[in-house]
Structure formats: structure tokens, C-alpha cells
Amino acid sequence: QYFSLLRESDKAIQALIEHYQDLDERTMIVFFGDHQPPLGNDFYEKLYGKKLDDRTTEEVFQQYEVPFFIWTNYDQPEREGVVLSSNLLGTLTAQLAGFPLTGYQQLHSRLLDVLPVNTTVGFRRPDGTLLGEGEESGLTETEEQLYNDYRLMAYNHLFDEKAHPEGYFGPDPEK
């Protein structure tokens, strides 16, 4: 059933793009999945030929990778092989659309340049270097400071609404 749904999704995406392809209004479509299908531990152990706890950092990262694409009906430089955490996809989209970035998105933009993948599993640098969970000491001082700034602001954004820096997470409501 999963593969037949993939085929149906492909058809729907094709229809969506064909609909917007020739419009005069600039249009951007962002498509991604937030997780791989839940195929069960047995499936992954057969796939890797080992117990899940014995996987390399790279193999653990692979389990969490999901493809995405950004399509526009106007000229946009084509990029392939972009690897980033889904929490940074909104910032990349805003950059490509030419939107002004909030303070929080500017922090995300710096993170995109330094640690484009930052998850509970670990980190990936732009050059592809992986740092697994528990190896935060492998981060440079600059990377660690940037990631700590991000974690603090993410916490503030989610749990401390009364202490939000004015206009940092979105348009200033006073303006």
C-alpha cells in the first residue's frame, strides 16, 4: 500500500506543478515529508544487517533523512544535494523567496551556514562531517556557541512567550 500511495502522491504533485507552471503570478511550492514511513525495527535491522544499536552515525542519520524540493514557476538557481534539518527549511524558503528575515530566521541562517543538520541524533557540517549524539565536544567553540544560542531562542520561542524579544520571531505587533 505504501508504494501505491507514493505513486498517487507523485501524480498529485505533477498535477499541482502543472497547474501553477504557466501562471503569471510568482509561485513557490515547498514539498517535504516530516518522517520516513514507520517500517518497524525488524525492517531496519534486516536493511542494515545488524542491530539498530550497532549502526554507524551515518546509518542513524540515514534513517531520519527525508527528501524535499522547492519548485518555482520563475527562474531560481537549481541546487541538488541540499541537506538540512527540517527546522531550517522555512528559513531557506524565506531566503529563496527574497523575504526579509526575522531575527530568529537570521539565527537560523547562520546555523544553515555552519551546522545545516542539527538534531537529537547529532550534527552535520556543510562539508558532510558528522558528529553523533553525545559528541558535542566535537563542535568548535563557534559552532557550540551558535547551537547554544539557537537552543535558548528555540526554548524562548516555545515556552517563554512573555519574554520574547520584540519583533524577533515575527513582525513587531506595534508597527
Question: Whereabouts are the PLM-identified features?
Answer:
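Solvent-exposed soluble domains appended to multi-pass membrane proteins
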Residues: 1-175
